[in-house]
Amino acid sequence: MRLLIDTHVLIWLMVGSPKLTKRCIKLLRDEGCEVFFSAASLWEVALKHERKPDKIPVAAEQVERYCRECGIRQVPVRFEHALKTCELEKIHADPFDRMLVSQALVDGMKLVSHDEDVIAYGDAVIAV
């Protein structure tokens, strides 16, 4: 299975947050799964870390380095992803989350998320 990690899950993984569920850890460690992160997540971290470093305790460069060292592969933002965001149901207004859902759908992945608004997108998402 191909898994795309939601931004908050990726940050929790990096900082060893107790919010990270056992189910999530087991899923991400499963050898049968390929794990990916989105370039959109780096952009989101860069913007939010600059504005609220107390809420986003890591910089985009740290996230990218962590992913590279852990073998988590990057998914670039492509034209098809942007178009898919326009087709999504208007469940959630956050543009970063909508992009991640779109990437998961277009690229045949499952988005790993703890965000209730994202989980509402159904089959494209694995709730953790």
Regions found by a protein language model. Name each.
Residues M1-F37, E50-R65, E69, D107, ...:
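Short, well-structured N-terminal submotif of metal-dependent ribonuclease cores
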Residues T7-H8, V45, T85, A104:
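Generic structural signal for small/hydrophobic residues in well-ordered secondary structure
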Residues G16-S17, K48, L88, A124:
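Residue-level signal for well-ordered alpha-helical positions
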Residues R29, L47-E50, E87-K90:
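A broad detector of the eukaryotic-type serine/threonine protein kinase catalytic domain
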Residues E44, K84-E87, A120-Y121:
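Phosphate- and divalent-cation-binding pockets in alpha/beta enzyme and binding domains
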Residues I56-E61, R68-E116, V128:
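Active-site neighborhoods of divalent-metal-dependent phosphate/nucleic-acid chemistry enzymes
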Residues G122-V128:
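Active-site regions of enzymes building and remodeling cell-envelope glycoconjugates
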